[in-house]
Design a protein with these regions (language model features):
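Short alpha-helical elements
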Residues: 1-291
Length: 291
């Protein structure tokens, strides 16, 4: 016999969800003001409300914008909610703005947390299973066919290069094709960090030239896990410290990807990236301002 859910527990969960949505909306509005954003006051929905709805979709509805729009309207959180096609157009129009807001949060965390240790790694996001590559309509390029060594399987999609604080809050990210190795992505990240920062990464980021350049020009130390044949071997205790510090980023990846649906539905490649960015931004806001 299946027991009915506790009404008090349902009410508590609902209240917590509403509080997180309201906090996200307030945080988004404050961030937009901080970057001096202005918009047309004649619009039915503000950019902050559009972005908050996308964040709500990522946090609670597996990225389903239609479900999030209905929830926001039904609970009178966004009474002037746009219909589906208009909402999607507005959301695509603010995609760069979402990116700017993420980096604004990253800058705040870098400057205010006093953090000097950061974690760097990548995780794959498939657009489809490898056997269905020929049916993909979002993009067609062999550059997006990558390999997941831990699972010993190929995938077709992108890699997210993610830089987080030591406590696991994302501060920088970049999207790369699935086949891109980590050294290539290292050169794509801005790594706009305070002098004296240390970035912990696995052995796939081994690039002595980039390592020396960062140390000399930016005073940033790249703490890479050394391979057995490395020219710059670590002492055993240094290797242990690096491993214990960088291991936490795997937990961050799990926390972000657990919000994903089984497959991310998108009509265009830009729409796919926008949804992934919303998942990352939602996780960042929750870690930085809500929890």
């Amino acid at each position: 016999m299946i027991q009915a859910e506790n009404p008090l527990q349902e009410e508590k969960t609902e209240r917590k969800m509403l509080n997180e949505i309201i906090t996200s909306d307030a945080s988004t509005d404050d961030l937009l003001k901080a970057i001096g954003h202005r918009e047309d006051c004649r619009r039915d929905m503000s950019d902050a409300e559009i972005i908050t709805t996308a964040i709500t979709a990522a946090m609670f509805f597996n990225g389903n914008h239609s479900a999030a729009c209905s929830y926001m309207k039904d609970h009178n959180l966004m009474p002037q909610m746009l219909e589906k096609s208009r909402f999607n157009r507005r959301l695509h129009n603010v995609s760069i703005l979402i990116h700017d807001l993420f980096h604004q949060v990253g800058m705040i965390l870098k400057e205010s947390s006093g953090c000097t240790e950061y974690l760097l790694d990548s995780f794959p996001i498939p657009m489809c299973d490898n056997i269905r590559i020929f049916n993909v309509k979002l993009i067609k390029s062999e550059d997006y066919r990558g390999y997941i060594a831990s699972k010993k399987r190929y995938f077709y999609g992108i890699r997210v290069q993610l830089l987080t604080t030591k406590s696991g809050i994302p501060v920088e990210f970049v999207f790369m094709p699935g086949s891109a190795n980590d050294v290539r992505a290292l050169n794509a990240l801005p790594l706009n960090l305070p002098a004296g920062s240390e970035v912990y990464a696995d052995g796939a980021y081994t690039d002595y030239t980039a390592e020396d350049d960062l140390k000399f020009t930016e005073q940033i130390t790249l703490q890479v896990m050394r391979k057995k044949n490395s020219k710059r071997k670590d002492k055993p205790w240094n290797q242990y410290i690096k491993q214990s510090i960088r291991h936490y980023i795997e937990t961050v990846f799990s926390a972000i990807t657990c919000l994903f649906p089984k497959s991310i539905h998108a009509v265009t490649y830009d729409g796919f990236l926008l949804k992934v960015e919303a998942f990352i931004f939602a996780f960042t806001l929750k870690q930085a301002f809500i929890e």
